[in-house]
Amino acid sequence: NGPHPAGLTGTHMHFLDPPNSTKTVWSISYQDVIAVGNLFLTGYLNISRVISIAGPLAKKPRLIRTVLGASLTDILKDEFYENEPCRVISGSVLSGFQAEGDLSFLGRYSRQVTLIKEDEDKLFFGWINPQPNKFSVMPVLASAFSFFKLFNLTTNLNGGRRAMVPTGVFETLMPQDFLPTQLLRSLIVMDTDVAQSLGALELDEEDISLCTFACPAKYEYGSALRDSLEKIEKEG
């Protein structure tokens, strides 16, 4: 119970039954449980799924019924404003993937499709502009005074990659009993021994997606975690 990431599988595992190098913990989504039950009752595999169409560019945000691996090109006909450049994401903005080309299909674990604006505009002297209409995790912009305001987020990174600076923001985003700044730093430099000792084996990409979103240095911690986990698997 609580705000994101309280509902993530990784958060539940951490507090109930954390995995480690000698223990594997499995999870299953509620729609897959329904499909398994239907298989036992009828003998037929139910591949239908209920997903949401969401995001600032969605004309009619709602729930729809579709099938596993459905073509998003077909699903999203007339679903977004074509006068705006749109990025289609299979999954959430935090842990989904850009669905285009050969990947323009519903992901195996995606429960939503997100439509956001492709934005590469640069703001002149943005670092000293009060920016009352731009969201920030840290209260450094004028928008911090708009407690109940909703923001239409885009693909704009609002900056470039730079050195990682420990600001204390990661500690406010991760509910697990970790040292997040030290863990994320070990992932960046591929120090898998330190990463394991700090709890990397309990995580997957979505568990640290908020850190990627809030990082002032613009690092992709999800891909760094995956690279470290693959290295750990290969080296033992």
Could you tell me what each predicted segment is?
Residues 1-74, 78-236:
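Buried, small/hydrophobic-residue-enriched core segments of structured protein domains
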